Amino acid sequence: MVMLDLLSNALIQIKNAEIMGKKQVVIWPVNKLIYHTLRVLQRYGYVGEIEYIDDGRGGKYVVQLLGKINDIGPIRPRYPVKYREIVQWEQKFLPARQIGILVISTSQGVMSHIEAKERKIGGVLLAYVY
């Protein structure tokens, strides 16, 4: 089976493990975009420790779950968003103000919509979590 969108696959694996009440999830296959997205989730307290395991076939991430994710998912298609439009996308994907984050890929790296608003930069929407 060919997986076309590794980020979507990883986020759905996390969502399914949270629903089942698991304490950790193994994400495979992986890439740098998945790692940077997981780091954003870790910075905001949605996931715990992230451990990389090199198995000789591309590697795996073992992610500790904290049980704080109500919903997580990819944003497809990956919409380009300007700095001034971030609030509109917040209203579309997040349940309320100050609840959850949007993950945005910018020219300065992968970050949350909160950081992007502080730095006044836009980017491409990758995922939402709350």
UniProtKB/Swiss-Prot annotation:
One of the primary rRNA binding proteins, it binds directly to 16S rRNA central domain where it helps coordinate assembly of the platform of the 30S subunit. It comes from Pyrobaculum islandicum (strain DSM 4184 / JCM 9189 / GEO3). Part of the 30S ribosomal subunit. Belongs to the universal ribosomal protein uS8 family. It holds the Pfam family Ribosomal_S8. The keyword rRNA-binding applies. It comes from the Archaea. PROSITE patterns: RIBOSOMAL_S8. GO terms for biological process: translation. This is Small ribosomal subunit protein uS8. One of its GO terms (molecular function) is rRNA binding. GO terms for cellular component: ribonucleoprotein complex; ribosome. The gene is rps8. Keywords: Ribonucleoprotein, Ribosomal protein, RNA-binding, rRNA-binding.
